[in-house]
């Protein structure tokens, strides 16, 4: 349900062809350790899913373009060169509901609302996010209870309950008493000012604790040159995968507690390539400017997004996998 903060300390070797190789072998997960189950609830399976963005706070148009292009890349009419964001989404789509319907193939950006006046202040809670959605719905956006998905993105000066201490993002569903219907939504914040070392890792490094023996490594260069935004992209991908496979908290997850589930992206937290796991990010790419990425998007964009659990392979997987 939430992207929980975990530090990952990477140990990588750079090969002559510009690709990273982890010192470890295959640690992409083990089916023996995973208790992922289907709990008979829905997945987001509409043939076309309408995505609505709520930009909360003051946003740089360049930052918005990077995020929009990622969302366009999920189901672009002309997918980017392999490995692409749309290839990554194919792994998410493996999950079905009890009718046999897979997760949606087409995610369409259908509307945006800019809440630049901070209508509910600069300090939000998990519950007040629903009021933010209500404000957007009464101002501009439609209430789409049929095939709508709402994405609340907060600027780097907005504080969120548990942000930087326990979470980088979360998903849930709205209450009819607040919004007027039950619709799935996700929240992700820009951590650049508050905790980039936690929610934008590996583009920012945690400060070593005195006496810990930990030596900070060279920071990875973000593929779009924006530490906070490039960090947000992976969290957005994480939450999109999980809200799609577990929108009402009774779909796909592991564990006994539906209010604190281990979902399909949680199982692969910190894994971005082959060999990843146990604190290693895995094999990823570097471009000519030494920016790190593992998938390509529309308009020549590149992104670094974490893998998700592959239902068929019984391990974490992404399109940049070496095997």
UniProtKB/Swiss-Prot annotation:
Coiled coil: none annotated. The keyword Signal applies. Residues 1-18 form the signal peptide. Keywords: Apoplast, Glycoprotein, Secreted, Signal. GO terms for cellular component: apoplast. It is found in: Secreted; Secreted, Extracellular space; Secreted, Extracellular space, Apoplast. May play a role in a brassinosteroid-dependent regulation of growth and development. This is Protein EXORDIUM-like 7. It comes from Arabidopsis thaliana (Mouse-ear cress).
